[in-house]
Amino acid sequence: MANTLEQLKLYTTIVADTGDIEAIKRYQPEDATTNPSLILKAAQIPEYESLIDNAIDWAKSQSANLAQQLDDASDKLAVNIGVEILKLVPGRISTEVDARLSFDKEQSIAKAHKLVRLYQEAGVDKSRILIKLASTWEGICAARELEKEGINCNLTLLFSFAQARACAEAGAYLISPFVGRILDWYKKDTGKDYDAVNDPGVVSVTEIYNYYKQHGFNTVVMGASFRNIGEIIELAGCDRLTIGPSLLEELANSQIDITPKLVAATSTVAAEAPLTEAQFRWDFNQDPMAVDKLAEGIRNFAIDQGKLEVMLTAKLAN
């Protein structure tokens, strides 16, 4: 009998949620995703020292201004790690725009252009890149413009149906609804435990997936942020699932019979009129879990970006 991971790959594209080259070699995913927290973790792996040195040297060659050097080194390091990962996966790498730009459409677009340019200078075509943006109204509007330019986007930190609907209406290439973080909130709020079938994160992704397929949206649904393999198994059949190394290992070492739980609708109905900004903000605000988790996610990514910059500042000073 094939292991659980091998079975899952029959129904769902598996993506590695890591910047760790060794983990990617081991589990052979189709794509990989990174974020500021994963870049910070990857930057502390000894094998990446040369990538950091290259980013520092490049940043110093671009500007004499320390703030600009720091910005450049951070972007270049994320791209350097992405380039290494792309040597191992046949598909795409997701690289995230600075979380501190989550409420600035124009600066998010400018940062996306810079990341794409750095990848292209490293010989990577934009067809292999997904630009990750937080699923704020501003992030979604930035994605709408980038998609028109042929720059595909991954809308992340997605916790609500309102966010998912707005992303699809904007023509986003892909969304990353966060399964485990939704579960975390409900467990803390209710004091209850949930089995995988009734897991609020699983229920949310299932609702989004069904809505997209029923209304003919092409936006890819990629479940993310898992707490256990039960959540993953209940989402077999989802377009993509991005999974961290520890859960990939658990899937590879187990033999649970997998059947597809999410199945695309065979007929579609006309989509509703797109959400206005006012409707989006109201609908989103009505979901206290989503409001809490989006704000927390942006803050935490910004904190880890700051930690990375402290590390890079010390190296720039040498």
Swiss-Prot record:
Keyword Cytoplasm applies: yes
Regions that span the bilayer: none
Listed EC numbers: 2.2.1.2
Predominant subcellular localization, coarse grouping: cytoplasm
Record-level GO BP terms: carbohydrate metabolic process; pentose-phosphate shunt
Compartment list: Cytoplasm
Gene Ontology CC entries for this record: cytosol
Catalytic activity: D-sedoheptulose 7-phosphate + D-glyceraldehyde 3-phosphate = D-erythrose 4-phosphate + beta-D-fructose 6-phosphate
Keywords linked to the UniProt accession: Cytoplasm, Pentose shunt, Schiff base, Transferase
GO molecular function: transaldolase activity
Pathway: Carbohydrate degradation; pentose phosphate pathway; D-glyceraldehyde 3-phosphate and beta-D-fructose 6-phosphate from D-ribose 5-phosphate and D-xylulose 5-phosphate (non-oxidative stage): step 2/3
Database matches in InterPro entries: Aldolase_TIM (IPR013785), TAL/FSA (IPR001585), Transaldolase_1 (IPR004730), Transaldolase_AS (IPR018225)
Active-site residues annotated for this sequence: 132 (schiff-base intermediate with substrate)
EC category name: transferase
Family: Belongs to the transaldolase family. Type 1 subfamily.
Quaternary structure, from the entry: Homodimer.
Function noted in UniProt: Transaldolase is important for the balance of metabolites in the pentose-phosphate pathway.
HAMAP family the record matches: Transaldolase_1
Protein name as catalogued: Transaldolase
Species, as recorded: Shewanella baltica (strain OS155 / ATCC BAA-1091)
